[in-house]
Design a protein with these regions (language model features):
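Hydrophobic, aromatic-enriched alpha-helical segments typical of multi-pass transmembrane helices
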Residues: 2-230
Length: 230
């Protein structure tokens, strides 16, 4: 791919670590994701706090950055021998992330209102939260979306392993989606680990791609100088 492509520009490559950074910041601010069926009062107090909405907005901004990062990875890897694999990795990852954004976006604006009503004495709101979001149609879509995203991240991992980018960065990247998608149900630590792996692997890949771009640019400049001097 041409080094002049916008996909290889500094700003575009910055989207890779930015997605990881926003995800980690959002998870730290949000804290453990409580279960309203186990501790309804604790969950309601957490969801009604200012941090809940703010943290989820940051997480969703990270997801938007991830959508763009999938296209960045396709631009970096699409012309390698794993080109077809990368296309499917990008497609599956975009579908998964788009489902996550559309569904959890509802939670950002609905759950805090329902939690405040519950704290004001409307116990029916707990049933609304459980039936509508945590065990209802939203959950029935989020988990398949997580499986789709996991497959996409694994395909990206394989493509990175076959490319000239750092192989182990690809391994770390392949672990991010399954941890972020499924760990929240049982372990905040593993969920946070998924965010940290996303930040580390994305930064590693962006740095390696940027250095490769500099080397290619220097090589082309040197060749041009040689041609002009002859």
């Amino acid at each position: 791919m041409s080094t002049n492509s916008p996909l290889r520009s500094r700003a575009s490559l910055a989207m890779l670590p930015l997605a990881g950074l926003l995800t980690v910041l959002g998870l730290i601010l949000r804290g453990p994701l409580g279960n309203p069926s186990i501790n309804p009062s604790g969950f309601a107090q957490s969801a009604a706090s200012a941090n809940f909405g703010t943290s989820w907005i940051i997480i969703l901004l990270g997801s938007v950055a991830r959508l763009y990062s999938f296209m960045i990875l396709f631009g970096l890897l699409g012309l390698t021998r794993a080109g077809k694999l990368v296309f499917w990795a990008m497609l599956l990852s975009i579908v998964s992330e788009a489902l996550f954004i559309s569904l959890t976006g509802i939670l950002v604006f609905t759950v805090p209102v329902a939690a405040q009503l519950y704290l004001q004495g409307d116990a029916h709101m707990l049933n609304v939260l459980m039936a509508g979001f945590f065990s209802g149609p939203v959950a029935s879509v989020l988990y398949p979306a997580g499986l789709i995203g996991t497959l996409g991240s694994i395909l990206f991992s394989i493509a990175i392993w076959r490319s000239n980018l750092p192989m182990w960065a690809g391994v770390l990247y392949g672990l991010t989606t399954p941890l972020l998608a499924f760990a929240p149900a049982f372990s905040y630590g593993l969920e946070l680990l998924g965010g940290l792996l996303l930040l580390v692997s994305s930064t590693w890949l962006a740095t390696a791609a940027w250095r490769q771009t500099i080397r290619e640019t220097s090589s082309r400049t040197g060749q041009s100088s040689m041609i002009s001097s002859t």
